[in-house]
Design a protein with these regions (language model features):
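N-terminal secretory signal peptides that target proteins for export/translocation
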Residues: 1-5
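Bacterial N-terminal signal peptides
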Residues: 8-22
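Active-site neighborhoods and metal-handling regions in enzymes and metal-associated proteins
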Residues: 26-463
Length: 463
């Protein structure tokens, strides 16, 4: 068995970024030296870079003078990593300078140098026995919760903000935005009431939802993350080569391979590695592997496709060559038309126009459309964000909620060229088609899209 990487009709160049890693007052770390260890120093560096660059931008874009984020112990919060903590009252104030003032009340942080003000950093927590509070510092639970807000009113009054963003959802449907944690609606009713009481009537009236600010902050990236994205992408590319190299036609099943492994037959029936009776790959099959690599700081993923040569074949048959051409043309359309500053929804509309102008049928569903023109190859898009938080927005896709399409694509947006090609093969019969899927990594810069690590290089030919 050998793999022939011959079907490379054209492959877009990938760009290796030369990125600075300097944070004033902090020890800097080369991400390439710490990937196996999940370096705490690198975590702190990423956190400080976001505080220095992303935080001022998103607060001013959303016209928020002060951002108060209440994080209660024992409650998952999407900003645990971003703030370096799992408890506290975090207050970020725009005082008209380049650097946003950062303060925390009644909480602890992993990197004290990241904050200007730390008030009561060590708060004694209740004692639990079998899940029941047996000893409560300061009295009953209400007293303890209220204690966390001591000093907040005076702190806020001294800064006199006009608009105070707080972590509760107001207009957006966010339940499906993250697999692991609530996104912007992490504030309990009790803490909301305690916060308003602590602020007093004057400043309580200035409170607004920080939902858009939080989403923009989670979507923001810094150069250190882009470098990790690149390095994990290279690791993923090696993993794909390894898995495709295992395939022996007629012997290897989908479940023998690592990653998200699947195949669709000419009727669109999908087979998965997790099937009770895993499919055994045969000559003439086309299949896909999606793989990934990462740590708690960042992650990357990549997809690859392969064709198993039939007996007597020495190269890909015409239909395989044609579906790869369609994939490359679609990739070039994405590269040429995704830019920062436009919303994901506006970008989706533009891509649909370009795809259809190129002679393809845009399909909003990842299933072959039997009612479409049988002479047109069908393209489906789910170009979503990739990163650490689980946030998939901004999302250039018909899938998901409207707010995911309403988000503006920021500079250094990390995302995946996830798109699918359904190419009809009339010679095989009505509705028969070939399916391939892509999951290339990409970054939006001020100058357009770059590919930080090699994309799918071509349909691998396996004999």
């Amino acid at each position: 068995m050998r793999i022939i990487l011959r079907l490379k009709l054209a492959v877009c160049c990938f760009v290796v970024l030369a990125l600075p890693f300097r944070i004033q007052g902090q020890e800097t770390v080369n991400p390439g030296t710490v990937l196996p260890d999940d370096s705490v120093a690198l975590e702190n560096q990423v956190r400080n870079s976001k505080f220095n660059t992303v935080l001022p931008q998103v607060m001013r874009d959303n016209e928020i003078d002060m951002w108060i984020h209440v994080m209660r112990p024992w409650t998952p919060d999407p900003l645990n990593f971003e703030f370096g903590s799992d408890m506290g009252i975090f207050i970020f104030t725009d005082r008209g300078e380049d650097r946003i003032e950062r303060a925390i009340f009644a909480g602890h942080v992993s990197d004290r140098n990241a904050y200007n003000i730390i008030s009561r950093p060590r708060v004694q927590l209740p004692t639990f026995v079998d899940g029941v509070i047996t000893e409560q510092p300061g009295g009953d639970e209400t007293d303890y919760l209220k204690f966390r807000f001591d000093g907040v009113r005076e702190f806020v009054a001294e800064r006199d903000p006009d608009r105070i963003g707080v972590n509760y959802a107001e207009a957006l449907g966010l339940s499906a935005a993250s697999e692991h944690a609530p996104l912007t609606d992490g504030l309990s009713h009790t803490d909301y009431t305690l916060l308003l009481n602590a602020l007093g009537d004057k400043y309580a009236k200035r409170v607004v939802s920080a939902e858009h600010l939080i989403l923009d902050y989670l979507a923001g990236r810094v150069p250190e993350e882009i470098e990790l994205y690149r390095q994990f992408g290279l690791i993923t590319a090696d993993s794909l080569d390894r898995e495709f190299g295992k395939v022996v036609p007629g012997v290897t099943s989908l479940s023998d391979l690592e990653g998200n492994v699947f195949r669709r037959n000419p009727d669109g029936v999908e087979f998965h590695a997790q099937d009770r009776e895993p499919y055994i790959l045969q000559p003439g099959d086309v299949f896909t592997i999606l793989h990934g690599a990462g740590n708690r700081i960042f992650s990357s993923d990549l997809g690859g496709n392969a064709y198993l040569l039939r007996e007597g074949e020495t190269e890909a048959p015409p239909e395989i060559q044609n579906v790869w051409r369609a994939a490359l043309e679609t990739r070039q359309i994405l590269l040429a038309n995704i830019v920062a500053g436009r919303t994901a929804g506006q970008t989706l509309d533009l891509l649909i126009q370009k795809i259809e102008a190129a002679g393809y049928h845009y399909n909003p569903v990842d299933q072959y459309d039997s009612t479409a023109d049988p002479d047109l190859t069908q393209v489906h898009l789910d170009v979503h964000a990739v990163g650490r938080s689980g946030l998939v927005a901004p999302r250039i896709s018909p899938l998901g909620s409207d707010w995911e399409r309403e988000m503006t694509i920021p500079v250094l947006h990390t995302f995946t060229f996830e798109y699918m090609i359904h190419m009809p093969v009339p010679a095989w019969g009505p509705g028969k088609h070939i399916y391939i899927a892509f999951h290339d990594g990409a970054v939006v810069t001020e100058d357009g899209v770059i590919i930080p690590y090699p994309p799918d290089p071509g349909i691998r030919l396996i004999r």
